[in-house]
């Protein structure tokens, strides 16, 4: 059995909890010297100590996995293309603060603040795309609403009773899905929205009104004002998704249906994209779903949404890999396309992808089209209905990469230009 060292993770946990080694050792029921050896990677992490850590601090065992470090190592490889992978992995594992500093260097050298959208993306990634207090608050909010047929009127009643906001349905045909006016004390919803979309929009505004302090508490560490504003918006959307698809219910549905996205979507009235994105956030300690990668892209390969609870690394420059199944999804509208792929580091993933369309538009105008993909490590694939009939062995997997500019597969027939 491979020995697993988690010194950096244990040290980070202890620092976040504000504990000395003596305090933490006492909580875990181990000696201070043993904890010191664990933190300095002089001793491997045993199953017994792992269980103690997860139980005492309410963590899932995946917190101590190497997935996060492998993803960071991939990001460092883009900035330091000549550095050995083993050394980058060591930096990501042993010196996370140094790794973050290296990642921040391009923006610092440019003398300008980082792109606020990238700041927010990294913010969600650092939280493993899961916010426990928001998720549980959303579940508590959704539970009394009961059946889907009644939840819209009940949310509207809560907004009116508790905050004096009137909900006006089918108020406009274009623009944003919803708008709130604090002066008029009303929330206006665009026409043509599905029941689940209306539930999402009302829950979004409820989060901003009822849980503003909680949103601020999460977003306050972000220095960039624009990024902080975007993070607050994203956190309210997170709450809305969690209220529309409550954690316990969607996890139960996912396990029961073997993660059949269409069946789950039918239960909650949600679209394929929304369901996939919510599945990618189910990382509650003690009740985790499969760790997923979620991505949305257009025909040109521009990634407009991305989140990962795995080691999968997205390239920060250039396009996406042309051999990736997400591009084939545009060829088969309204059908799920599957792929087993292997990355240059040897990790094998199973992917499901599908084209999704925006709302209907007038004749002659282009309709928004994207492809969304949901992927997981092949080790979890047999838990999904999409693995049935697929050969999951690495030998039969399609070799893909992070993108041509940083991909080490020099002999790839689809390479668009040489690697940096």
List each model region and its residues.
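Short juxta-domain linker segments that transition from a proline/glycine-rich
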Residues: 2-5, 12-15, 26, 30, ...
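Residues within helix-turn-helix
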Residues: 22, 33
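Short, conserved structural micro-motifs that define repeat-unit consensus positions
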Residues: 7-10, 20-21
């Amino acid at each position: 059995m491979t020995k697993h060292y988690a010194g950096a993770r244990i040290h980070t946990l202890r620092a976040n909890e504000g504990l000395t080694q003596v305090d933490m050792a006492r909580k875990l029921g181990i000696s201070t010297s043993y904890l010191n050896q664990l933190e300095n990677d002089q001793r491997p992490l045993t199953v017994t100590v792992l269980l103690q850590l997860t139980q005492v601090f309410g963590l899932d065992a995946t917190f101590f996995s190497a997935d996060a470090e492998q993803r960071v190592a991939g990001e460092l490889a883009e900035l330091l293309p000549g550095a050995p992978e083993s050394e980058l992995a060591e930096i990501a594992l042993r010196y996370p603060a140094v790794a973050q500093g290296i990642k921040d260097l391009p923006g610092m050298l440019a003398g300008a603040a980082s792109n606020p959208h990238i700041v927010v993306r990294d913010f969600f990634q650092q939280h493993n795309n899961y916010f426990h207090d928001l998720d549980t608050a959303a579940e508590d909010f959704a539970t009394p609403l009961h059946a889907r047929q009644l939840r819209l009127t009940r949310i509207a009643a809560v907004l009116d009773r508790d905050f004096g906001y009137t909900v006006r349905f089918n108020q406009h045909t274009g623009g944003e899905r919803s708008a709130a006016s604090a002066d008029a004390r009303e929330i206006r919803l665009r026409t043509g929205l599905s029941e689940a979309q209306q539930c999402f929009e009302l829950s979004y505004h409820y989060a901003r009104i009822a849980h503003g302090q909680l949103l601020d508490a999460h977003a306050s560490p972000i220095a960039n004002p624009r990024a902080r504003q975007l993070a607050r918006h994203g956190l309210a959307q997170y709450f809305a998704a969690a209220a529309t698809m409550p954690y316990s219910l969607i996890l139960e549905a996912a396990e029961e249906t073997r993660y059949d996205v269409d069946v789950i979507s039918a239960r909650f009235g949600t679209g394929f994209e929304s369901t996939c994105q919510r599945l990618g956030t189910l990382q509650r300690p003690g009740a985790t779903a499969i760790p997923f990668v979620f991505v949305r892209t257009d025909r040109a390969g521009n990634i407009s949404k991305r989140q990962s609870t795995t080691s999968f690394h997205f390239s920060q420059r250039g396009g996406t890999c042309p051999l990736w199944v997400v591009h084939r999804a545009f060829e088969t509208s309204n059908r799920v396309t599957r792929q087993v792929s292997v990355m240059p580091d040897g990790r094998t993933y199973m992917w499901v992808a599908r084209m999704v369309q925006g709302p209907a538009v007038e004749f002659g105008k282009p309709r928004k089209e994207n492809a969304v993909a949901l992927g997981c490590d092949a080790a979890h694939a047999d838990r999904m209905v999409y693995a049935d009939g697929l050969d999951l062995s690495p030998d039969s997997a399609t070799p893909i990469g992070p993108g041509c500019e940083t991909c080490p597969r020099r002999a790839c027939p689809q390479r668009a230009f040489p690697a940096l």
